[in-house]
Regions:
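Active-site loop of short-chain dehydrogenase/reductase
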Residues: 6-7, 78-79, 93, 124-137, ...
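Conserved glycine-rich cofactor-binding loop
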Residues: 15-16
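Conserved glycine-rich Rossmann-like NAD(P)H-binding loop of the short-chain dehydrogenase/reductase
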Residues: 29-45
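Rossmann-fold cofactor-recognition segment
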Residues: 49-63
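Catalytic Tyr-X3-Lys loop
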Residues: 88, 95-114, 133, 157
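A short, exposed helix-loop element centered on a Lys and neighboring polar residues
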Residues: 117-118, 162
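Catalytic loop of short-chain dehydrogenase/reductase
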Residues: 131-156, 162, 166-169, 184
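C-terminal helical subdomain
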Residues: 170-185, 191-233
Length: 233
């Protein structure tokens, strides 16, 4: 079995939590890491820890996304792993939602994913090699009250990933969508005392991403659901 080998990873929507865990894991595997976010000041410590480079980018702006890939190529190289970890939310009672805020939330979760994935695919297809990974959520498969914009964006993102997987997988590009069905533990967000183990460990999630990246072509996963063992579903 031939295990895919990767050299450069780009994580879009980078911040603390899962993005940081992915950056650390990729760096430990000898993969060079690029981090993209609207505000990169928050990424300084992670860059120093992992040797990653940070790039400012609004993922909903087509020109900025194209420039992002150009800068990453010039400064690091062409990414053969691209993770889309950005999402937008606009919470509220359905009849009170502000249309402009809803449009922005959907743009971040779905349209930004399209823009980033399109630039990634253009560069991966000539080599018939690469992986494009999308971070989904419980809202990717079920809508919750007062969370319609998040559900719309995540449902659309999942549809994008599924369509891409069916089109690009036969051309050598591994497209995978991860349904993160539960809250992710962080320094600012921990399990309540009466519900131990009720949140996902970001390092454990990152390991699942890595396991998917290591799959031989004869047995690729397109979608994976991850949740704590105590989570009801």
């Amino acid at each position: 079995m031939e295990i895919p080998k990767y050299k450069i990873a780009l994580i879009v929507g980078a911040g603390e939590g899962l993005s940081a865990s992915l950056a650390r894991l990729f760096a430990k595997q000898g993969i060079r890491v690029a981090l993209a976010a609207r505000k990169i000041e928050k990424l300084g410590a992670l860059c120093r820890e992992t040797g990653a480079r940070a790039f400012a980018c609004d993922a909903t702006d087509a020109d900025e996304v194209e420039r992002l890939f150009g800068m990453v190529e010039r400064e690091i190289g062409t990414p053969d792993i691209v993770v889309y970890n950005a999402s937008g939310r606009a919470r509220g009672v359905f009849t009170d939602l502000v249309p402009a805020e809803v449009a922005q939330a959907i743009a971040v979760s779905a349209f930004g994913g399209f823009l980033v994935a399109q630039q990634a695919a253009k560069r991966m297809l000539p080599h018939k090699h690469g992986a494009i990974l999308f971070t989904g959520a419980s809202a990717s498969v079920k809508g919750y009250p007062q969370s319609a914009p998040f559900a719309m964006g995540k449902f659309a993102q999942r549809g994008l990933a599924q369509s891409m997987a069916r089109e690009l997988s036969p051309q050598g590009i591994h497209v995978a969508h991860f349904v993160i069905d539960g809250g992710i533990r962080s320094t600012a967000r921990v399990e309540p005392a009466d519900r131990p183990d009720s949140m996902l460990d970001p390092d454990a999630i990152a390991l699942s991403y890595w396991n998917v990246l290591q799959q031989p072509r004869s047995a690729w996963t397109w979608e994976l659901e991850l949740r704590p063992w105590v989570e009801k579903f």
